[in-house]
Amino acid sequence: MEIRLINIGFGNIVSANRIVAIVSPESAPIKRMITEARDRGMLIDATYGRRTRAVIITDSDHVILSAVQPETVAHRLVSKMEQAHHHHHGDNGKD
């Protein structure tokens, strides 16, 4: 399986293959998950002091905080996958 990388803001790169979920940080269960990840040393803060807009959960149980909207991250994820599919079909990745 090829490794796909996704930009989650400020030049921070995450392996797209390892992402399980991209969720909003607003709900209490997610906030609790962030706190628990911090306690376990599994929290990666990639917000650069900005407001957390997306919480990315990986298959290794890491919790990544991003200042990018969940939809934006998801869109990048989807367009990366589409680029992989259309790689040899003359599609230049434009919407």
Curated annotation (Swiss-Prot):
Domain of life: Bacteria
Pfam families in UniProt: RemA-like
Similarity annotation: Belongs to the RemA family.
Protein name: Putative regulatory protein Daud_1598
Organism: Desulforudis audaxviator (strain MP104C)
High-level lineage: Bacteria, Bacillati, Bacillota, Clostridia, Thermoanaerobacterales
